[in-house]
Amino acid sequence: MENIPVTKTFHHTTYPAIDPTSPANSAAGKTVAVTGGAGGIGYAISRGFCKAGADTVILLARRQHVLSEAAAKLHAEFGTTVWTYTVDIRDAASTSATFASIRKRLSEDSGEDEDVDVLVVNAATLHQGENVIEYEPEIVRDSFETNTIGNINVVRAFLTPEIPAIPKTPFLSGITFGKKKEIAGVKAPGRQKVILEVSSVSTHILFPEQSLYSASKLASTHIFRFLQTEIDKLPGSPVRIHSFHPGAIRTPGLADVTGEADMNSFEWDDPSLPEGFAVWLSTPAAAFLKGRLVYANWDVEELIAMKKKFEEDPEYLTITLKC
């Protein structure tokens, strides 16, 4: 993939600064949940957090046999506690019940009110190969129900303890649409949480015959930016959201919809790239990137050196209209 020149260095595999085994990137004491965590990019990211020493890694997906196989492999390799939950993120009630069950289980084990620390929003569906107006309505609907609405369902379930305390943001000074929200006396838990959205280069680059995937992923990433501005109103800004393109990773899901000749003609990035980058992005060192869309390929040390640019331009590396 052609480099968008944000950093001079464009990585295709892991490197020391994002190494999950580095003490600087430790996930010790953390509980991490990954949607679509049993295969492809999600599995690579789950593996990264196991490498980084996370206490518990929770895999969420639709097929139990795939979840069981992935969990067994991760536990055998790293000794990490791995939980699995079958859930269809398109089902809001089921997704909320799943996270309620996770919170209950974590709290029972520790005797305190516990929750997931890092949520990786990765599950997605890819429909491609047709012109825009040739997709059947059910295919259009499925793309948005998974890639956009499904992601909202997951984050709503994850942030259930925080939601009552999030104030409404006025459209204009003194103007708020909808019902008034009463938050007086409502206290947010204050637990530090991180949301990592696995976004895509196709949110801002036109790829032929990928209109549905591109549009639904774009909608998701843009909604996450709105959400960051809303939850920043909580005291202490306890939740940060990062959207990132994981690199060009050859996955079984992509192979299912792409011809073998096309797959073999492309220069792919190594799964170790998103594996390490996601772990680094969850650390305090990456806090200045919250609300932005970044590439896993970009060099993190060069990004850190650009911190002042991010502070001076709140729209830098966001999806917006620049004139």
Which sequence ranges carry the predicted segments?
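Non-catalytic terminal and boundary segments that flank Rossmann-like NAD(P)-dependent oxidoreductase
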Residues: 1-31, 161, 167-177, 305-323
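C-terminal helical subdomain
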Residues: 8-9, 13-14, 243-244, 260-323
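Conserved glycine-rich cofactor-binding loop
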Residues: 38-39
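Conserved glycine-rich Rossmann-like NAD(P)H-binding loop of the short-chain dehydrogenase/reductase
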Residues: 54-70
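Rossmann-fold cofactor-recognition segment
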Residues: 76-93
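Catalytic Tyr-X3-Lys loop
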Residues: 117, 125, 133-152, 170-176, ...
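A short, exposed helix-loop element centered on a Lys and neighboring polar residues
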Residues: 155-156, 225
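Catalytic loop of short-chain dehydrogenase/reductase
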Residues: 163-180, 184-237, 247-249, 255
